[in-house]
């Protein structure tokens, strides 16, 4: 099961939303993780946003979060491009049940589910889902609905 993700190989352009997120992570002086999550999930309360901040007591702990987007290959020159190409070679042979559950309002990964569905044999015949009125973090935007999707998928594979 994949949700709101991509496995870039550097040979196709990434979305404007992804590139904006990448630039923001690199350039924004006040990199407040809780506030970032709160902007995309306005229903999160102060305590929930604070919980997302908890692993980052100061900026030195945020290096991984800042660097993470730069690991996604934007050209085939990236080391991770070759790793992802190899992963796709395996996924293109994967014939076990494979489900996509994406949201309708994620500016970074919108439409990415179609590639997974087209390329992975195990996607055939699955109850792929687009969760409506949800953004990138499905567990926050539509936690119960997403859990129901996962539970039904697991039950269908027994």
What are these regions (language model features)?
Residues 1-132, 139, 153-157:
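Flexible "cap/lid" subdomain of the alpha/beta-hydrolase fold that forms the substrate-access gate
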Residues 134-147:
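Catalytic histidine-centered segment of alpha/beta-hydrolase-like enzymes
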